[in-house]
């Protein structure tokens, strides 16, 4: 090829140089197989007619003969040179190549035809060009197969950015200047040469050929290389039909261009057939560091190779996103709003118009640069006239998403002068749906409910695990990055002393939020319209209620079980649990709000033998709110002990501690919340007598009970004989039990302070408060003596151990009888003691 360029045969030509058509060896083999080739005679006629029109209109337009197109359709198709597969459908052929032959070029050989320089690395070729061909821009690469070796031959075109075709023979007129040609994306950028030093061929060697404008020739060379990269063996005349409807901008030399090497030293082609890598790329083209580490372990390849493989695949598919777009796409994919769609090839019918398009149909700032997740749309055009050849196939962009589209498209411009009967038009793009602008995560303000959930979790652990993060995502609706950022900021603020998060302040915020939440309409999914789910049957509601009593936040296994048993969808179950949690919280807050200071004073003065208004209110709200109501019941000794132990440790339990207490005691969660509310109020008034005992003696035995507390509730085995007269005599004289006198009285009577106070009739307020607390003396009703009807509370001898066991048995019996019977047993104690005195 170099010897042909150095031919010294003189020839009178125009300033536009002749571009020779290089046909590789594969084309000759394809001709031998019977695939259609151009017909020179018909091409001559079309070329002559086109020259006449172009001389009048000062334009150059590509023309292909209809007979050639029909001959190609009848004879040829698309044949794979690596296997016997052949088809006439471009979509099927492209899918076959992508699936069956992902690796095409292995160890390419780069050859510079001007200098006979040979290398196996593209970097070496680039260095060679910078040293021996400085400032050269018109490089051309031709792919040749020689003895199972792929050769990329580099040559220099003498086009001077103007391309035209001159033919020998009489009647050939001079044509106007051609269309400027730019280099392919593979070539190095640089300034064009000022003078063309190449001499064209002899006139007798110039074969008559179709007139190809610059951009069409550019795409022919590029498509030739790309087709062979994908394992395609196409004909040169077939590639002549593909012309991008883009025009090079006038400032093309000022636009920065990046050369794309076909091979790098670190690229590992073995990853092209790795199913794990392909699936990961199809899910998201920008892997995180954690995903890279996982892929390194799964594929047994270095991380640097995986990074380069991902970058190459993104370049191959035309994906170029900014960091902001990557973050937004990752958030949308996490929220389930993006479905990863692989690039598809779609064939759409084109519209025909009789007008002449003088301006480019499609314009972009960079030639043939497609950004984002796009689909390739090939628009074949059928012509109704025998004098006009097949119109070029238009390359349009049908974007799946709008992440990568950097510049707007220019609409077609029509001129009033008709020139051709038919010409291809770009189909109008579908109207875009106006999407609301996405608010950055940092600009979104969190609601009070979201902050309350985050603070409650922050009190538990400043470094939440994945399970806690997913729970917060479900509860608050925030993204994972937002939750992580909030925790990071508050850890820093807590270390600096800027923010102090305590359980007391958190409880006040939760109460304020719950108070402001009354009267609102709740939706399980605030980002969408109110969900209209079908009504649930009683059996489904019962199954859901049973699961809710176990845990208000079901696990994944529990959700799968509920879906199987209830036949409901995951979304319906999540919605039901969300509404049920809100109903529970609002009911608890209503119970707490109803216990004001005014109502509490009225409830304290309630007479014996009657339920207080607080108990009536709690029972009524439980009946109306819960599907399976449970009235306020008397608490057993074990339940009271667990509640008191927790209260001594913290007066404001967390939701998790409430759930644990409900599971351990068997009480309703609302009843536990009410008990803590009452005891907090009593603690402020100083009427909680057992608080000091639980604070100073927290040691528990194997069963979870304080040894001293159990000892206090157990009667003494022995007591002095005169000890039985101390308590009635003390009550008879001062008629009132004082706290300071109690310390003197306890050593003389040889019993605990609690049993000593039980021997005396308590005030109405103390009786009511003790009953609301569920204190341990609820079960100490009067055990009447059948013979004398006189109750002795203090004097106990060794021989009365049977009576002690009977009295302890009556403890549990009295606890199960209810609040009304407890009041009657308390009232019976007064006349009995008075008779004894």
UniProtKB/Swiss-Prot annotation:
Zinc-finger listed as a keyword: yes
Record-level Gene Ontology MF annotations: DNA binding; DNA-binding transcription factor activity, RNA polymerase II-specific; protein heterodimerization activity; protein homodimerization activity; zinc ion binding
Residues bearing the modification Phosphothreonine: 37
InterPro entries noted in UniProt: HD, Homeodomain-like_sf, ZHX_Znf_C2H2, Znf_C2H2_sf, Znf_C2H2_type
Low complexity bias spans: 167-180
UniProt biased composition (Basic and acidic residues): 192-203
Sequence segments annotated as region (Interaction with EFNB1): 27-77
Tagged with keyword Nucleus: yes
Region (Required for homodimerization): 195-358
Gene3D superfamilies the record matches: Classic Zinc Finger (3.30.160.60), Homeodomain-like (1.10.10.60)
Known DNA-binding region: 263-324, 439-501, 530-591, 628-690
Residues bearing the modification Phosphoserine: 825, 827
Broad class of where this protein is predominantly found: nucleus
Residue location of crosslink Glycyl lysine isopeptide (Lys-Gly) (interchain with G-Cter in SUMO2): 64, 455
Region described as Required for interaction with NFYA: 263-497
One GO CC term on file: nucleus
Keywords: Differentiation, DNA-binding, Homeobox, Isopeptide bond, Metal-binding, Neurogenesis, Nucleus, Phosphoprotein, Repeat, Repressor, Transcription, Transcription regulation, Ubl conjugation, Zinc, Zinc-finger
Localization annotation: Nucleus
Function recorded in the entry: Acts as a transcriptional repressor. Represses the promoter activity of the CDC25C gene stimulated by NFYA. May play a role in retinal development where it regulates the composition of bipolar cell populations, by promoting differentiation of bipolar OFF-type cells. In the brain, may promote maintenance and suppress differentiation of neural progenitor cells in the developing cortex.
Family: Belongs to the ZHX family.
Subunit structure: Homodimer (via homeobox domain 1). Heterodimer with ZHX1 (via homeobox domain 1). Heterodimer with ZHX3 (via homeobox domain 1). Heterodimerization with ZHX1 is not necessary for repressor activity. Interacts (via homeobox domain) with NFYA (via N-terminus). Interacts with EFNB1 intracellular domain peptide; the interaction enhances ZHX2 transcriptional repression activity.
PANTHER family registered for this protein in UniProt: ZINC FINGERS AND HOMEOBOXES PROTEIN 2, ZINC-FINGERS AND HOMEOBOXES RELATED
Name this polypeptide is given: Zinc fingers and homeoboxes protein 2
Source organism (scientific name): Pongo abelii
């Amino acid at each position: 090829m170099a010897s042909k360029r150095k031919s010294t045969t003189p020839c009178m030509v125009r300033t536009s140089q002749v571009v020779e058509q290089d046909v590789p060896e594969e084309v000759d083999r394809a001709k031998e197989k019977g695939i259609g080739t151009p017909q020179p005679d018909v091409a001559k006629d079309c070329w002559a007619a086109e020259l006449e029109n172009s001389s009048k209109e000062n334009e150059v337009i590509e023309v292909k003969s209809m007979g050639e197109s029909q001959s190609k359709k009848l004879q040829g198709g698309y044949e794979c040179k690596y296997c016997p597969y052949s088809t006439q459908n471009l979509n099927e052929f492209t899918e076959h190549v992508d699936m069956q032959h992902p690796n095409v070029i292995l160890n390419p050989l780069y050859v510079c035809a001007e200098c006979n320089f040979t290398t196996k690395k593209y970097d070496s070729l680039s260095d060679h060009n910078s040293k021996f061909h400085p400032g050269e821009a018109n490089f051309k690469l031709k792919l040749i197969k020689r003895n199972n070796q792929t050769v990329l031959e580099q040559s220099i075109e003498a086009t001077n950015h103007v391309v035209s075709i001159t033919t020998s023979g009489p009647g050939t007129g001079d044509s106007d200047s051609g269309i400027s040609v730019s280099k392919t994306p593979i070539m190095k950028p640089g300034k064009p040469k000022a003078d063309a030093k190449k001499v064209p061929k002899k006139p007798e060697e110039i074969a008559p050929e179709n007139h190809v404008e610059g951009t069409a020739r550019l795409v022919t060379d590029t498509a030739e290389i790309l087709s062979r990269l994908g394992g395609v063996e196409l004909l040169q005349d077939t590639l002549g039909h593909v012309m991008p409807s883009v025009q090079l901008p006038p400032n093309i030399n000022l636009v920065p261009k990046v050369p794309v090497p076909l091979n790098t030293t670190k690229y590992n082609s073995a990853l092209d057939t790795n199913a794990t890598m392909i699936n990961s790329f199809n899910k998201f083209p920008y892997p995180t560091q954690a995903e890279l580490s996982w892929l390194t372990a799964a594929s047994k390849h270095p991380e640097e190779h995986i990074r380069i493989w991902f970058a190459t695949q993104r370049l191959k598919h035309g994906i170029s996103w900014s960091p902001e777009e990557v973050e937004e796409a990752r958030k949308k994919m996490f929220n389930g709003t993006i479905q990863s769609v692989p690039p598809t090839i779609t064939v759409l019918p084109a519209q025909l118009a009789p007008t002449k398009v003088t301006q480019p149909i499609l314009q972009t700032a960079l030639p043939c640069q497609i950004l984002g997740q796009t689909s390739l749309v090939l628009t074949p055009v059928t012509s109704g006239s025998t004098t006009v050849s097949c119109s070029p196939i238009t390359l349009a962009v049908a974007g799946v998403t709008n992440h990568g589209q950097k510049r707007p498209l220019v609409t077609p411009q029509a001129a009033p002068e008709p020139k051709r009967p038919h010409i291809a038009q770009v189909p109008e793009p579908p109207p875009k749906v106006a999407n609301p602008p996405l608010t950055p995560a940092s600009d979104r303000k969190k609601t009070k409910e979201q902050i309350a959930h985050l603070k409650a979790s922050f009190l538990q652990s400043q470094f939440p695990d994945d399970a806690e993060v997913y729970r917060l995502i479900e509860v608050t609706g925030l993204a994972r990055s937002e939750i992580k950022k909030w925790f990071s900021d508050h850890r820093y603020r807590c270390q600096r002393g800027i923010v102090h998060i305590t359980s007391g302040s958190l409880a006040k915020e939760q109460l304020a939020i719950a108070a402001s939440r009354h009267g609102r309409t709740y939706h399980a999914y605030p980002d969408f319209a109110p969900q209209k789910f079908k009504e649930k049957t009683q059996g489904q509601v019962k199954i859901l209620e049973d699961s809710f009593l176990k845990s208000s936040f079901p696990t994944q296994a529990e959700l799968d079980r509920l879906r199987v048993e209830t036949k409901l969808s995951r979304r319906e179950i999540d919605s039901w649990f969300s509404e049920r949690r809100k109903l529970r919280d609002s009911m608890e807050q209503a119970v707490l709000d109803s216990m004001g200071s005014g109502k509490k004073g009225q409830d304290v003065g309630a007479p014996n033998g009657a339920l207080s208004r607080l108990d009536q209110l709690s029972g009524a709200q439980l009946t109306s709110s819960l599907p399976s109501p449970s009235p306020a019941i008397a608490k057993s000794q074990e339940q009271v002990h667990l509640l008191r132990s927790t209260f001594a440790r913290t007066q404001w339990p967390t939701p998790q501690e409430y759930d644990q207490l409900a599971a351990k005691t068997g009480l309703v969660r609302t009843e536990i919340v009410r008990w803590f509310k009452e005891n907090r109020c009593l603690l402020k008034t100083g009427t909680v007598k057992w608080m000091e005992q639980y604070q100073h003696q927290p040691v528990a035995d194997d069963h979870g009970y304080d040894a001293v507390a159990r000892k206090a509730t157990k009667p003494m085995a022995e007591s002095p004989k005169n000890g039985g007269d101390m308590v009635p005599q003390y009550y008879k004289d001062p008629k009132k039990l004082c706290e300071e006198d109690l310390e003197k009285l306890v050593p003389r009577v040889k019993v605990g302070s609690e049993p000593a106070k039980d021997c005396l009739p308590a005030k109405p307020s103390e009786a009511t408060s003790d009953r609301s607390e569920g204190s341990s003396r609820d079960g100490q009703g009067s055990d009447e003596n059948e013979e004398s009807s006189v109750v002795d509370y203090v004097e106990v001898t060794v021989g009365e151990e049977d009576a002690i066991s009977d009295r302890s048995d009556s403890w549990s019996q009295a606890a199960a009888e209810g609040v009304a019977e407890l009041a009657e047993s308390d009232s019976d104690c007064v006349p009995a003691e008075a008779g004894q005195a």
